[in-house]
Amino acid sequence: MKFSIAAAVVAFAASVAALPPAHDSQFAGNGVGNKGNSNVKFPVPENVTVKQASDKCGDQAQLSCCNKATYAGDTTTVDEGLLSGALSGLIGAGSGAEGLGLFDQCSKLDVAVLIGIQDLVNQKCKQNIACCQNSPSSADGNLIGVGLPCVALGSIL
């Protein structure tokens, strides 16, 4: 009996985790019609250049453009009973609704070498713009190459 309940819970968790992503435009990396992601929590002002943004990140972090952001915050869910809330993290409920931004699928934004070129950072990146800590690790999906800790640029401007 206990084994069948555990097997049912594991099967349900696997089916929820294997669901395809929603086709909603707010979750698209570059938005509908290449107009940017409407789900950017900390937007960067329109007049900020790539050089200004890179200077704000400092020499210990690199300016990055991130396709995916997960926000975890101040909400606390108290679940009671056997297996209550065991799958809430998989379905998007409970703790992790809003707040601290964890960024994924980031690529480095290069500062223009030529003096006089003032590219606006919002033209280079339509997604989440972040300052990611310099590290020799890689964020390629394996467990050893841990993703870099990043902070939204809009939250520190």
Curated annotation (Swiss-Prot):
Subcellular location: Secreted; Spore wall
Pfam families, sorted: Hydrophobin (PF01185)
Induction remarks: Expression is induced by the transcription factor brlA.
This protein's UniProt keywords: Cell wall biogenesis/degradation, Conidiation, Disulfide bond, Glycoprotein, Secreted, Signal, Sporulation
Signal peptide: 1-41
Disulfide feature: C57-C131, C65-C125, C66-C106, C132-C150
Entry protein name: Class I hydrophobin rodA
Organism of origin: Emericella nidulans (strain FGSC A4 / ATCC 38163 / CBS 112.46 / NRRL 194 / M139) (Aspergillus nidulans)
Gene assigned in the entry: rodA
